[in-house]
Amino acid sequence: MDNTLNAFLRGIIEAATEFLPVSSTGHLFLFSYFFPFQNLSVPHEAFEDLFDIFIQTGAILSVVVLYYKTLWSHLVEAVRFGLGKSTDRSGFQFYLNLIVGILPILILGFLLKSQLDQIKMRSDLLLILGMSWFVGGIIMVFVEKRHLDESSGKTIGFKESIIVGFLQCFALIPGVSRSAATIISARTMGVSKKDSAEFSFFLAIPVLTLAGIYKLYKHRQILNSETIGLLLFGSIISFIICYFIIRLFMAFIRRRSFISFGVYRILLGLLVILYFVRY
């Protein structure tokens, strides 16, 4: 497959799965397993690693564009509260929740970075992905069936942010999905579908941005005209498609539960496990 077409398709896959609770990283690995980049002038593994995180930044930018009014208004409120010019602490609490929510995965990810890199090299990675999709799907269906009532009015507070932050660490396991870990954990505490999804979006901004900066520094030696072109192209595709996917996703969950995503994970997990066992 031509590398430009490969980058285009990966950008679409990233955009379609990043903020859905189905694991974008798992889908990208599955695609690269069958359709790797060809004839690159740089080490393939390093470029694959950088490309995946780079196109995630495109998806992140779509969140910033879609929610810039919310992010900016909360920032203004936080600054005014910090300077003592306002008693409204909602903006300050918003960003405090985000900081608390990202610290566990940043710390654990840093401590385990060498082990996490080794996981991608394992011969049984497909089995790990399949099991993660399957088990995560069962948990998602179970949680949604128990929390279909949206009348509790529970919102994301400091305590909820801590719990979501720690449970987000499970997303370090390939196939678990950062979105699934954060959404499911919020839903178990009675938070609405909308608030659970949006908090997951907001958590992704600092987590994936910092991960992108780290990967860019780590693989800086492979940057050249060929790789930069593919990275930017994939990111632009991811940004454009993800902008519309998020809007469709939010419209979907206003009417439906997350059960369909759980069923999808179960079926995909079974297919991947069967493929691994057979081949």
UniProtKB/Swiss-Prot annotation:
GO cellular component: plasma membrane
Function of the molecule: Catalyzes the dephosphorylation of undecaprenyl diphosphate (UPP). Confers resistance to bacitracin.
Family: Belongs to the UppP family.
One matching Pfam family: BacA
Organism: Leptospira biflexa serovar Patoc (strain Patoc 1 / ATCC 23582 / Paris)
Keywords of the record: Antibiotic resistance, Cell inner membrane, Cell membrane, Cell shape, Cell wall biogenesis/degradation, Hydrolase, Membrane, Peptidoglycan synthesis, Transmembrane, Transmembrane helix
Taxonomy, superkingdom: Bacteria
Full protein name: Undecaprenyl-diphosphatase
Note, other: Bacitracin is thought to be involved in the inhibition of peptidoglycan synthesis by sequestering undecaprenyl diphosphate, thereby reducing the pool of lipid carrier available.
